[in-house]
Amino acid sequence: AMDITVVMTGDEELSGRPLALSKKALIDAAKYADIALGFENGDGNPATANVSRRGSIGWKLTVTGKPAHSSQIFREDIGAGAIYEAARILTQFYTELRQEDLLTFNPGNILGGTKVTFDDQAKTGTAFGKDNIIAETALVTGDIRAISEVQLNRVKTKMQAIVAASYPHTSGVIEFSEGYPAMAPTAGNKRLLEIYSGVSQDLGFGEVTAVNPLRAGAADVSFTADYVDMAIDALGLGSNKGHTAEETGDLATLPTQTKRAAILLLRLQNAH
């Protein structure tokens, strides 16, 4: 017999915090499961499914410089100011980290000047400064998407080292916030895709191949990855304009996806 637990989750764009609490039911179910099937839409192509998803976390860089009249910038006892230092850090992120396979890191907001304010929830802020005053403060926020926790930890260490190598009379601090874990492309996940693709072909719907992780965002299925032997995502209803106010479900995909999922469950039951 097969025991099936269905966990209904909301849009990950609006997940409650802390994630350990809002995803507790999903994590608890995964701890007692062998296989996780995710029914989120994938990249919109019914010929693909996800055996891996990159994790996603946020970061905030706060930089401080020595304020002075702009005519004195670069003096040995004054330095370059906070904005130049923030620019150095971002440039080094770009030059030293972008070669990492399947990694992306994006600065989404930047503010700088004599004084800045930033609302983390609304993602809005203000900056005050004068053209003839060396910037005292700079703030940058962004995200990182990595294919594994190993990669994420390695990149975080590199980013911290880059931030620590400050220009004279500047200093920086980078903070990382909680986020979605990665689902690595394990042998078990790839085997599950083979079974699913076989089902699809037997039904006359064609082969199913793996989505390139660069074309897929984070998803709730990743919270199961550390606990199950196999996981796959993108088995659900197709959609258009995902994560927008105009998002719609493509009902024409429902019969195909339903048949695939039903036969997949049957074959998994027979295999066990």
What does each of the following model-derived ranges do?
Residues 41-44, 66-272:
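Metal-dependent amide/peptide-bond hydrolase catalytic core
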Residues 1, 31, 56, 100-102, ...:
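Short, well-ordered coil/turn elements that cap or connect secondary structure elements
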